[in-house]
Amino acid sequence: MAHCMESALLLLLLLGSASFTDGNRCVDAAEACTADERCQQLRSEYVARCLGRAAPGGRPGPGGCVRSRCRRALRRFFARGPPALTHALLFCGCEGSACAERRRQTFAPACAFSGPGLVPPSCLEPLERCERSRLCRPRLLAFQASCAPAPGSRDRCPEEGGPRCLRVYAGLIGTVVTPNYLDNVSARVAPWCGCAASGNRREECEAFRKLFTRNPCLDGAIQAFDSLQPSVLQDQTAGCCFPRVSWLYALTALALQALL
Ligand SMILES: *[C@@H]1O[C@H](CO)[C@@H](O)[C@H](O)[C@H]1NC(C)=O
C-alpha cells in the first residue's frame, strides 16, 4: 500500500520528464518484483540464503553463505516466481554501467556464481559435474536443444524461438553451470570458468563456453525480450498503482487550486 503510493507519486513526478523514458530497466524490474507478493517473497528467500561469499567444501562462508542452499533458493525463484517478473530481472536491458552492474549483481554472484577460489576453473570441470548430476544434466541438454545454433551454422536458431531459450537459460541458474553476466560493460554471459588451462581438450571447452558467450540465438532472444519489457512491466504494475494516480491527481489539483 505504502509502496503503491510511493510509486504513484514517483510516477507523477516523472511523467513528462525525459528521464522517464531512459530509466534503469533493472531498477524497474526490481520494483515490479517488490510489488508482487510471490515474487518478493521468493526473492527475499534467495537473498537471505545468498548473502556473503561461498566457502570451499560446502561450509558456510564469511557472512553465512552455503552455496548449495543459495542455489536451491534461486532454482525455486525461477521455478515458482511469475516468469514475466523473474525474466524481467534476469534480462533487463541496460545502456549504462550502473544498470549493468546492478544486473550482474542480481543473483548474489559471490555466493551463487563465482569462487570459492580466485581463479575460475576450466569450463570442463562444471561441465563434467553437470553431466553427472541428475538435476543439472537435463537442464543443460534442454539449453543446448533450445538455444544452440544449428550445427554448422552460426545463426540458424532453433525453431521454437526465443521465449523457450530464455526459459531454459533461467533453468540453469542455481545449477553447477549457473551463468551470469561477465562484466558491467557488455551483455556477455557465461558460467564462472575459463578455457585457458584446458590442455588438449580446449576445443571441447570452447564449444561449451560458446553456448553462452556470444551465442547469437541467446543474445537475440534476450534482445527480443528486452524490446517487449516495458509493456510487460506496465501490465504487471497496472493492477497495483494506476487507479491511485487518479485521486492523487485530484488531490494535487486541489492543492494547486488552494495555492493559486
Ligand atoms: C564496473 O566494473 C568495474 C570492474 O569490476 C568496477 O571497478 C566498477 O566500479 C563497476 N562500475 C559500476 C558502475 O559499478
From Swiss-Prot:
Expressed in many tissues including adrenal medulla, brain neurons, with highest levels in the cerebral cortex and hippocampus. Moderate levels found in the gut circular muscle and myenteric ganglia as well as in other peripheral ganglia, including the sensory dorsal root and trigeminal as well as superior cervical and sympathetic chain ganglia. Isoform a1, isoform a2, isoform b1 and isoform b2 are exclusively found in the thyroid, parthyroid and pituitary glands. Keywords: Cell membrane, Glycoprotein, GPI-anchor, Lipoprotein, Membrane, Receptor, Secreted, Signal. GO terms for cellular component: extracellular region; plasma membrane; side of membrane. SUPFAM superfamilies: GDNF receptor-like. It comes from the Eukaryota. Disulfide bonds: none annotated. Residues 1-23 form the signal peptide. Glycans are attached at N184. One of its GO terms (molecular function) is coreceptor activity. One of its GO terms (biological process) is negative regulation of ossification. Residues 238-260 form a propeptide. A lipid is attached at T237 (GPI-anchor amidated threonine). The keyword Glycoprotein applies. Belongs to the GDNFR family. Interacts with ARTN ligand and RET: forms a 2:2:2 ternary complex composed of ARTN ligand, GFRA3 and RET receptor. Interacts with SORL1. Receptor for persephin (PSPN), a growth factor that exhibits neurotrophic activity on mesencephalic dopaminergic and motor neurons. Acts by binding to its coreceptor, GFRA4, leading to autophosphorylation and activation of the RET receptor. May be important in C-cell development and, in the postnatal development of the adrenal medulla. This is GDNF family receptor alpha-4. The gene is Gfra4.
